[in-house]
């Protein structure tokens, strides 16, 4: 009985996840689908042909989005590891304040944050640049990385590194050979979360990038706002495909890194 309930819940969750994806695929080739009709009244290849007909622009948007999100994910992982080790293993003045600052971006609405940081970035010359967008995304994504890596760092502790030091390892060797392989699943999960947060940012990218830095979100959202569901669906499917591909790459890296042939780093 318990197994049947679990299977029913899993089936329901799969339906909730897959049904919107199926509707996106249908809307890619739909020109008119008015309520209350159950099926589209008119099919068309207009949206798909228009998007894929601009391959040059599409590739630029693709590389820009992946570059920004990958940079944010990598920086979030590196800074997250260093921050968590400092907060967990060391005592210093202002430790509690630093811990509070790591979650502060959670408390500030994105609109308020974007408006405030835009003025600062204009003075620093970082507006309308990819580096400025990466830095802004990093501030929003870093708390996710810190929170995820913090739990893993606390659970692991420093005892194994201390034993490696006793056996003659340097501080870097003790971390790289002992702690890092164990923390790899947590670090990659944090990087994945940071990637998703960055990849889906619209308002912050618009404010800091000033329309000069184009990502999938910047291109897709105007079609959603204008009601052109066919065009929005094409970009949404591409958005989903790119994200799943990157997550597949992270899964492969996780398997290689941890040398675990039985499961990936999400398990």
Label for each model-derived stretch:
Residues 1-8, 13, 19, 30, ...:
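C-terminal transmembrane helix and the adjacent membrane-cytosol boundary/short C-terminal tail
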Residues 1-4, 68-102, 115, 119, ...:
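Transmembrane-helix boundary motif in ABC transporter permease subunits
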Residues 2, 45-57, 198-256, 267:
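Interhelical loop and adjacent transmembrane-helix boundary motif
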Residues 16-17, 72, 76-79, 101-112, ...:
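Faces of alpha-helical transmembrane segments in polytopic inner-membrane proteins
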Residues 33-72, 225-227:
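Periplasmic/extracellular loop-to-transmembrane helix junction in inner-membrane transport proteins
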Residues 36-39, 95-96, 111-141, 172, ...:
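Membrane-interfacial helix termini and adjacent extracytoplasmic/periplasmic loops
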Residues 57-64, 119-142, 184-191, 235:
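Loop-to-helix entry region at the N-terminal start of transmembrane alpha-helices
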Residues 63, 67, 93-96, 156-189:
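Amphipathic cytosolic juxtamembrane alpha-helices at the membrane-cytosol interface
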């Amino acid at each position: 009985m318990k197994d049947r309930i679990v299977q029913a819940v899993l089936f329901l969750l799969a339906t909730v996840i897959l049904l919107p994806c199926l509707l996106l695929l249908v809307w890619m080739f739909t020109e008119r689908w008015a309520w209350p009709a159950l099926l589209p009244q008119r099919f068309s290849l207009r949206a798909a042909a228009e998007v894929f007909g601009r391959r040059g622009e599409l590739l630029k948007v693709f590389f820009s989005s992946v570059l920004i999100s990958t940079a944010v994910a990598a920086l979030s992982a590196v800074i997250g590891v260093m921050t968590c080790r400092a907060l967990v293993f060391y005592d210093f003045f202002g430790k509690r304040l630093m811990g509070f600052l790591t979650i502060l971006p959670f408390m500030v609405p994105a609109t308020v944050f974007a408006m405030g940081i835009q003025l600062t970035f204009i003075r620093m010359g970082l507006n309308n640049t990819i580096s400025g967008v990466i830095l802004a995304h990093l501030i929003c994504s870093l708390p996710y990385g810190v929170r995820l890596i913090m739990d893993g760092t606390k659970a692991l502790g420093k005892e194994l590194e201390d034993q490696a030091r006793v056996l003659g390892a340097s501080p870097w060797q003790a971390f790289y050979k002992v702690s890092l392989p164990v923390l790899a699943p947590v670090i990659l999960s944090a990087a994945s979360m940071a990637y998703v947060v960055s990849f889906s940012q619209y308002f912050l990218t618009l404010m800091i990038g000033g329309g000069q830095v184009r990502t999938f979100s910047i291109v897709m959202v105007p079609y959603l706002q204008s009601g052109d569901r066919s065009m929005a669906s094409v970009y949404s499917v591409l958005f989903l495909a790119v994200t799943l591909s990157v997550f597949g790459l992270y899964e492969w890296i996780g398997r290689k890194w941890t040398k675990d042939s039985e499961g990936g780093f999400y398990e």
